[in-house]
C-alpha cells in the first residue's frame, strides 16, 4: 500500500493546481485520473481552443494552459497515476484509503476531489450517428484539420460559439444552428462570433444529413418553415455532455444533482475529503477554471491543517523570501 499526504482525484486544471499547492505546502501528492494524460476536459475536448477567462492571460490555448500547470507542479514531483480510476474509499485508523482500479491502494492524509464533471459523454445528434467519424465529430483536437471545410456547428452554449470563433478563420464556411432563439453561451462570446462572417440560424434543427460514406450536406428546418439544404462536410455537435460520477456516488458523499456539496473550507461531509472545481456545489457557485484555482488552494490549505493540526492554515505567499 502506497502512502501519500494528499491524493488528488482528477488531473484537470483544478487538480493540477491542487498538486502544485500541495507541493508548495511541503506535502507529498498523487494525482489520479482515468484519462491517459493530464488536462481533463481541456485536453480531451478543446486543447487548441483559446481560453479567455483565466486571470493574467488575455487568451491562452487549452494545451498551453495545461502544459503550464504541469510545469508549475513539476518541482514538487507529484506522482501521476493516469489511465486508472479511484473506485473505493475506506478508512483505516481514521485516514482515507483509496482503492484504485487494478487493486492498488493509496493510504492518504487527505483526499481532494477535482473530477470536473466526472466522466463525460457527449449528447448525441440523433440524425448524425451513422456518420460518426466520417463527418460528425464531438471534439476537434486539431482545428487545422478542418481547413477549407464547410462546417456546421449544432448547439447554443459556450462550446458551440467557441468552436465557431476558432474555426471561422480556417474553414471555408461556418454555420451555427440552435433550436432556440436564446443562447446559453456568454454574451461576450456570442457578440464576438456575431462580428465574424459566421451564419447563425436560430429556432432551427438539423433534420437530415446527406451523403454516402461521408457527409455532403445537411437539411436545416426552421420552426414553421421549409427545410434548407446546406453544403456541409463536417458537423460539430456541441450539444453538451451527460456526466457520470461513477464510483463516487457509492462513497457516501452528499450530492446535489451530480455535484459534491462542500462548505466554505471546501470540505465534504466525509472526514478528510475535500473537493474543488466544477464538481463542487455551494451557494453562489460559479463554474469557471479561474474559480477552481482558488477552490483548490482553499481545499489544500484546509487539508494541510487536518493532516497536521499544528500547521498554519495560511502558509504565506509563494513570493515570500524570493
UniProtKB/Swiss-Prot annotation:
Its cofactor is FAD. Coiled coil: none annotated. InterPro entries: FAD/NAD-bd_sf (IPR036188), FAD/NAD-binding_dom (IPR023753), Fd--NADP_Rdtase_type_2 (IPR022890), Ferredoxin-NADP_redctase_2 (IPR050097). Signal peptide: none annotated. FAD binds at residues 14, 33, 41, 46, 86, 120, 278, 319. Disulfide bonds: none annotated. Its EC number is 1.18.1.2. The keyword 4Fe-4S does not apply. Pfam families: Pyr_redox_2. Binds 1 FAD per subunit. The keyword NADP applies. One of its GO terms (molecular function) is ferredoxin-NADP+ reductase activity. It comes from the Bacteria. Keywords: FAD, Flavoprotein, NADP, Oxidoreductase. It catalyses: 2 reduced [2Fe-2S]-[ferredoxin] + NADP(+) + H(+) = 2 oxidized [2Fe-2S]-[ferredoxin] + NADPH. Belongs to the ferredoxin--NADP reductase type 2 family. Homodimer. This is Ferredoxin--NADP reductase. It comes from Salinispora arenicola (strain CNS-205).
